[in-house]
């Protein structure tokens, strides 16, 4: 069993049923390969949730609970690990221990002796990407050395998806961990147990009274803080923090060391907030972000009405993005992959607008950050379209009571950018001569004939508006 088998089961657990043709196309496997995968999985699944082919569908009744139980049954003696998985697990172990004997450590993966050597290129690529060094200690094993802050940040990214936040901000294992992630979570939670409690207390008593972090930001902070406290206990302090001084940060004074606090403050500033007081003022960056905002506002069709909110959101995003890109503090997000194709002009415009900031802070924004910035701007474009575009003036001609028409009006308001200056009875159509309007709406045939007889243009729709009615109204340039 390997990672593909688990991915296949996870997809079926999410969707219950999958057409055979789609499965072959989605996973790039032949039907015979998929059948072998199903057979392998069924050996560890209860019979009532077996995978089976039903005509042209692959189906199962497995739920999340059965899926979690299945993963607990998958041990390394039945799971073929990849080099990337083994290296990620070892990378965490090298952070949690001063020296690790790789040959001994790899025995848990049930692989051949030569696998350790074969995995070396993958390990070198990982550590060199974070400016770290794997030092050989004769007759003992290997030691991970290099910039202490970079080391912690890199290892946090390997741990993050394996844990969740439990009660009282305490980290616990993710319930549906695959074998490698389960191994990583177990060693982290075991080795850092006292520090996890200490980190939760620091967050509750020192940090949360000042800011409110979103779930993912809070989880990252708790992982980093637990790891930092564990490393500090073993004598691995951050001895130099000049690399963390490229932006002004708010000081939380969590740890008893200036260098440690400087790096922790920077890390917190990069995270996702649900409530962020304006504590991240960097005078130099403010000037550059103002220029960036002006560039973005110059794009045709954009009018920003609430410039304070606009600047604050762009500033906070760029501030965090600089830190995240410098230290690789972000994950890929498939939902953002299509942004460049959908909005190519905006993509190019955003790239140009942030170029000056990238150059001056010696970083390069990832595609994920560029896509996010495009969506922030599109959000303001949609918001401000409601402010900028004149509302369509609609008058409803009806003999119905106000209470009944009130519902109809609210449905229209929820779907269209309109104003309804009046609702008039058919017997009052003479008033239309004195009213300014763009469109008349009615929902009865009787009133339609009266309006037609009076030579007035109108649209007749159903009181219970249908999709066809919405289409008809959009044809009247209601948006």
Task: Label each PLM-derived region with a short phrase.
Residues 2-479:
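A cross-family "folded-core" feature that marks the main globular domain of proteins
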């Amino acid at each position: 069993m390997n990672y593909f088998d688990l991915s296949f089961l996870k997809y079926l657990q999410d969707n219950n049923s999958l057409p055979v043709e789609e499965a072959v196309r989605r996973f790039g496997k032949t039907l015979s390969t998929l059948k072998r995968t199903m057979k392998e999985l069924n050996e560890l699944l209860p019979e009532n949730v077996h995978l089976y082919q039903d005509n042209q569908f692959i189906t199962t009744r497995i739920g999340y609970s059965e899926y979690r139980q299945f993963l607990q049954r998958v041990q390394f003696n039945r799971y073929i690990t990849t080099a990337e998985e083994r290296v990620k697990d070892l990378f965490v172990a090298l952070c949690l221990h001063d020296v690790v004997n790789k040959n001994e450590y790899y025995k848990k993966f049930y692989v051949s002796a030569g696998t350790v050597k074969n995995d070396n290129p993958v390990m070198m690529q990982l550590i060199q990407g974070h400016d770290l060094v794997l030092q050989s200690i004769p007759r003992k094993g290997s030691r991970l050395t290099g910039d202490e802050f970079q080391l912690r940040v890199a290892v946090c990214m390997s741990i993050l998806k394996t844990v969740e936040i439990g009660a009282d901000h305490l980290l616990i294992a993710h319930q549906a961990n695959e074998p490698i992630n389960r191994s990583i979570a177990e060693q982290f939670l075991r080795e850092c147990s006292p520090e996890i409690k200490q980190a939760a207390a620091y967050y509750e008593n020192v940090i949360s009274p000042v800011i409110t972090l979103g779930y993912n930001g809070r989880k990252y902070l708790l992982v980093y803080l637990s790891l930092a406290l564990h490393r500090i206990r073993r004598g691995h302090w951050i001895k130099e923090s000049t690399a963390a001084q490229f932006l002004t940060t708010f000081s939380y004074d969590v740890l008893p060391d200036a260098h440690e606090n400087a790096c922790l403050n920077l890390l917190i500033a990069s995270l996702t907030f649900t409530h962020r007081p304006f504590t991240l003022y960097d005078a130099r960056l403010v000037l550059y972000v103002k220029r960036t905002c002006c560039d973005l506002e110059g794009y045709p069709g954009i009018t920003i009405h609430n410039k304070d909110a606009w600047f604050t959101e762009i500033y906070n995003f760029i501030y965090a993005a600089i830190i995240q890109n410098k230290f690789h503090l972000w994950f890929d997000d498939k939902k953002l992959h299509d942004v460049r194709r959908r909005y190519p002009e905006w993509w190019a415009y955003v790239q140009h607008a942030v170029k000056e900031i990238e150059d001056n802070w010696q970083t390069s924004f990832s595609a994920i950050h560029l896509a996010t910035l495009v969506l922030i701007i599109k959000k303001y474009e949609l918001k401000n379209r409601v402010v900028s575009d004149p509302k369509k003036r609609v008058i409803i001609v009806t003999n119905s009571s106000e209470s009944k028409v009130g519902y109809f009006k609210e449905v229209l308001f929820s779907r269209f950018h309109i104003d309804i200056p009046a609702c008039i009875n058919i017997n009052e159509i003479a008033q239309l001569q004195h009213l300014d309007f763009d469109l008349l709406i009615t929902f009865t045939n009787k009133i339609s004939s009266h309006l037609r007889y009076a030579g007035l243009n109108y649209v007749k729709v159903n009181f219970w508006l249908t999709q066809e009615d919405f289409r008809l109204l959009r044809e009247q340039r209601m948006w």
